[in-house]
């Protein structure tokens, strides 16, 4: 099989199922595991990822309003790679290449590849995606084992918290810094599984723009900053700077952490289990292991 993955989560699922050698192409954002970094890239982004949060947001909105795609597919490269399976997504047209663009291009390839969209917006949905990918690439047993492993890890966190009768802090998770967005989809469930209460969103709901007043009025006792696509260093640097602004004076004294959103919360794949364990270590540090310094850093 010749697999092209157009999203990091798909790439991570394929790798976790032991089919890394069948990947022949990936998106420009696929960086884990490190072995995929040498594979041909079949997508590009029209927005400078190193620009400021507000500049990125404005450019994405401008492009979307113009009707142009934020992400482009390299048709010639895709044709050269001759994939038999393309993994895509239906979740967000400003997060990855749209399913419609993929199907349009796939229809002119000869032979036509199977196009498989990943649709999960909750942990259960992500588990279903893993099973579906496993079936598509002939790795059903590995997929079932991976889903069971993820469930077992989440269960261990739950049982530890339950046995300790740990209090449930009020948690606000910020997915974008300017404008502010509350994290949605699977993130509220990550918080709940890690022992907290998400005060800004419900599991499965879309990420939504919020103002700082709403965050303040939600009375969080823990602030988590996990900007979509930012690594830990950038997340920590820009989130700490945000907390120093006058609009956030009310948050003085509230514990705050920066999270590697690029690795943990932006990708609906196997590492969501790592995300739960990381958040649990922040939420209940006296009960569960401290989070890895590679994934989280306290900023206040």
What is the predicted role of each segment?
Residues 1-300:
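N-terminal ligand-binding lobe of clamshell/alpha-beta domains
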